Amino acid sequence: MVKSSFDILGIGCVSVDDLLFVPGSYPAADTKTRVLSWDRQCGGLTGTALVAAARLGARCAFAGLLGVDDFSRIVEENFLLEGVDISHAPRAKDAPAPHAVIIVAAETRTRNIFYRIDGRIGADDRLPDESVIRAARILFLDQYGMNGCLRAAKIARAAGIPVVADFEDSDHPQFPELLRLVDHVVLPLDFAQKITGETAPETVAKAVWHQDCQAVVVTCGTAGSWFLGKDGVVRHQPAFKVLAVDSTGCGDVFHGAYAAGLVQGAPLDQCVRLATAAAGLKATQPGGQRGIPTRTQVEEFLASNPETYGSPKT
């Protein structure tokens, strides 16, 4: 029996990220490079999105797989620190938290990610209980643990609960089925181009749309985002100019902030604007989660009438 309800229930991937910051550009092969600094933060598509939503005031819970290893304990401690409920997250010995090493180049502000997965990750096939999913106002998921993601999305669809998703891989044969169960499809341009075969953001957004969609958002970094809702009109949200130092986690923060705006009743354009601001502010600090802004920080930033990049020709 569920004792409490949540604004956003996340079922997907979490990780522990070790970030190494190096001077110049990414090191060449067979060279020795000095590390400027080292940092450990939690990450993962769903994990980072939930932290972002929680900092923006949403009541969040994580119900994806956690292991009994040291990295899983780090993830648990981080969620508790951020106010994310983990009481419904299944624990399993064969589900250690993924670990990533991220090399961030100071000069080019680019990153290379090296990750290790040693067992099951993401959604469990049978947990959480259906009542837990029905207690949420929004279900957030990624593609990790496909059978569990499909189960959760079908339960949410039957209950009329909107599904927001963060995808980075379409290779699983059941991915198209999962995509059709997502109400708010928020994708980076390169991934959306891959699954549609289209090029221009406006065309890509229309190609991603399906009859059960509430919204499609295609994110394009400093070029901003293109989005459309039920009216079928594609609109553009410019990116805000910030002093970016690291883009790690920006896409996941965008997803979490979008979900937070959605659960708080904001219209589509304001959800995208909120998400754009949150992702931009995150980019001003290194790592995937430490730089995630609070609601107050985002509101103050938007109130300052921040400069945006010009709308590019497409």
Q: How would you label these PLM feature ranges?
A:
Residues L80-D94:
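A glycine-rich helix N-cap at a beta->alpha junction
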Residues M1-L9, R34, P201-T314:
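Conserved phosphate-binding/catalytic region of the ribokinase-like
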